[in-house]
Amino acid sequence: MKKFNRQEIEKKVNDVLVDKLGIGYSDVKPDAQLEQDLGADSLDAVDILMELEKEFYITIQDDDIYSMTSCKVSDVYDLVERLQK
């Protein structure tokens, strides 16, 4: 299984966010909050996490799902990086 570097993680996460939230790449900044800045709700968060699991071959725990809407984009990068180890 391929391990993705940070740059690849950021690009793939950004692609998923743009696709699932219908936003532009210019909206996706590391310090943007998923709910407050990007308009993600809890259903969006589940959809995003399911896609990330497929893209990165990882399993995301329920605890991470519950905190997803209040986290920043950079937190999502960190989560993926941590879970693929």
Where in this protein do the model-derived segments appear?
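Phosphopantetheine-dependent thiolation modules in NRPS/PKS and related acyl-activating systems
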Residues: 2-40, 49-50, 54-85
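Two-component histidine kinase catalytic core, primarily the HATPase_c
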Residues: 44
